[in-house]
């Protein structure tokens, strides 16, 4: 009997939080996720004197992206994009990396640093080759309503070791891509003006 009383007294003395009858606070922010599609226009980064072999230098295509924002002003972006030229030439990228954003009412400017894999398809489907690739980008998301967003963005890509691995290619490869798209928002509080939404 005394042992049980002593253990109870020690437990309540050492852990006073056990005496509280209030509930623990709940999380105040939900995870925000967007999934969207893009239409892209690109300068493929091919030297202008290579148009005889590689065709036109204004590529067009599209892609998909997803953003996951676990905290205010910081998130993660994943994207896949493919742009097409002529002569069977196309460029495809698979990227992931951090993004940083600010909120101003319905406007959300952002910047991102992505890394991933890039694939170049050579003229007339002769061959394709993959490279490690890095991207610096930025843009603006505009909230139409609680679930739909419009996006405009620019990306500068650097395909590492392209110029050294591709024989007789006129220089390195650094595509520039402008994209416009729309996304659907899941979770979070899209109508809140605090934090992101």
Which residues are covered by each model-predicted region?
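Outer-membrane beta-barrel translocator domains and adjoining extracellular loop/strand segments
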Residues: 45-53, 57, 88-94, 121-129, ...
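Gram-negative (and chloroplast) outer-membrane scaffold detector with strong preference
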Residues: 65-134, 142-146, 175, 179-186, ...
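Hydrophobic beta-strand positions in extracellular immunoglobulin-like domains
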Residues: 115, 140, 154-156
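Predominantly the C-terminal beta-signal and adjacent terminal strand-loop region
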Residues: 136, 145-197
């Amino acid at each position: 009997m005394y042992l049980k009383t002593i253990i109870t007294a020690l437990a309540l003395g050492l852990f006073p939080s056990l005496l509280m009858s209030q509930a623990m606070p709940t999380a105040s922010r939900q995870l925000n996720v967007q999934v969207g599609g893009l239409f892209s226009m690109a300068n493929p980064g091919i030297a202008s004197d290579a148009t005889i072999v590689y065709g036109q230098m204004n590529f067009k295509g599209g892609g998909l992206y997803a953003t996951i924002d676990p905290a205010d002003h910081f998130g993660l972006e994943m994207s896949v994009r493919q742009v097409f030229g002529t002569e069977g030439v196309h460029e495809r990228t698979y990227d992931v990396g951090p993004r940083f954003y600010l909120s101003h009412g319905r406007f959300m400017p952002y910047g991102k640093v992505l890394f991933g894999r890039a694939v170049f398809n050579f003229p007339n489907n002769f061959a394709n080759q993959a490279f490690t690739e890095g991207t610096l980008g930025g843009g603006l998301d505009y909230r139409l309503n609680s679930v739909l967003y419009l996006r405009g963005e620019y990306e500068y890509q650097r395909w590492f070791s392209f110029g050294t691995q591709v024989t007789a290619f006129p220089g390195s490869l650094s595509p520039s891509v402008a994209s416009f798209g729309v996304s659907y928002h899941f979770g979070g509080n899209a109508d809140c003006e605090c934090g992101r939404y």
